[in-house]
């Protein structure tokens, strides 16, 4: 897999619009498996190179100001080599910006590995996992990571799960040297990658296991909640039994006019049966309660 992070020129107080992609891409950070570490940086007018703070194994390539198209094309060639691309908020920014900027610069669609959908970005021949959407999923936040983070920014999540943070030079981004820009961008790509690799690839293993159980593509698992996982599994079981799956409107029509008489005074429906608990310590306890309050308390 390969993590991707980009940096873009911007006017003070205005965030670049990925749909318009009017500003130059100034850096592309790439961190992949098998010790793949590379960063592309666009030279900008009046910006010094500065000092290289990166490790020797990280390859830094500088492009002249008029070579942005070549820089993006080179990044696309690398992206095509990996079956999994990992980003942080890549659905909303990084990949749409690269896609639209490439189109704006005249890179043909045949040479663009990205594919835009209505509310997400993916690859023509691969899987894109947006960790922002994955880690803001309460199923992962609460059950997998014990709510160790409450804010979903890359900095907050990385600090909680990895004990690492984004780089802060204390300068406006347009005041950074080229090597500082490279270090900043690569560090974001590295944090994104390590969120999938820490604790023996815990998150990637979880995604694969849930995809197998829920019979869903792994990129859908990474973006959808537990109710969709269960629905997909039920669809699979229905099809395996050659059973028809009713449409939602058919279910609604079926229940029209159905009324339930109260069985308990002043209540419309009978509540669940409450069993008096036996005091003491209990082992081999199993809880089956989806997205509810009580399993969280028990945990």
Residue ranges of model-derived segments:
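Structured core elements
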Residues: 3, 86, 128, 274, ...
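Short, glycine-/Ser/Thr-/acidic-enriched flexible segments
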Residues: 7-9, 35, 134, 280, ...
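Active-site-proximal helix-loop-helix substrate-binding element of RNase H-like nuclease domains
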Residues: 37-42, 46-66, 85, 95, ...
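Common nucleic-acid-contacting/processivity interface regions adjacent to the catalytic cores
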Residues: 172-299
């Amino acid at each position: 897999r390969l993590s991707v992070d980009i940096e873009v020129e911007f006017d003070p107080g205005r965030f670049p619009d990925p749909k318009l992609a009017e500003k130059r891409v100034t850096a592309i950070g790439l961190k992949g498996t098998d010790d793949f570490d590379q960063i592309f940086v666009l030279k900008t007018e009046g910006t010094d190179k500065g000092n290289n703070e990166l490790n020797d194994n990280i390859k830094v390539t500088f492009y002249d100001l008029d070579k942005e198209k070549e820089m993006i094309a080179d990044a696309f060639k690398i992206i095509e080599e990996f079956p999994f691309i990992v980003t942080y908020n890549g659905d909303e920014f990084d990949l749409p910006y690269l896609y639209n900027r490439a189109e704006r610069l005249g890179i043909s669609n045949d040479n663009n590995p990205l594919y835009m959908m209505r509310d997400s970005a993916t690859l023509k021949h691969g899987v894109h996992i947006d960790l922002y959407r994955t880690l803001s999923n309460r199923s992962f936040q609460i059950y997998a990571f014990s709510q160790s983070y409450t804010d979903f920014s890359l900095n907050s999540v990385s600090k909680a799960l990895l004990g690492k943070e984004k780089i802060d030079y204390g300068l406006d981004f347009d005041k950074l040297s080229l090597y500082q820009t490279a270090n900043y961008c690569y560090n974001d790509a590295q944090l994104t990658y390590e969120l999938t690799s820490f604790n023996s690839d815990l998150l990637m293993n979880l995604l694969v296991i849930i995809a197998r159980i829920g019979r869903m593509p792994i990129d859908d698992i990474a973006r959808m909640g537990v109710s969709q996982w269960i629905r997909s599994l039920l669809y699979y079981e229905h099809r395996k039994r050659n059973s028809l799956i009713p449409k939602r409107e058919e279910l609604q029509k079926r229940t029209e006019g159905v009324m339930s008489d109260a069985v308990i005074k002043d209540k419309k429906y009978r509540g669940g049966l409450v069993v008096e608990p036996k005091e003491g310590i209990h082992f081999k306890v199993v809880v089956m309660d989806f997205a509810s309050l009580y399993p969280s308390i028990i945990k």
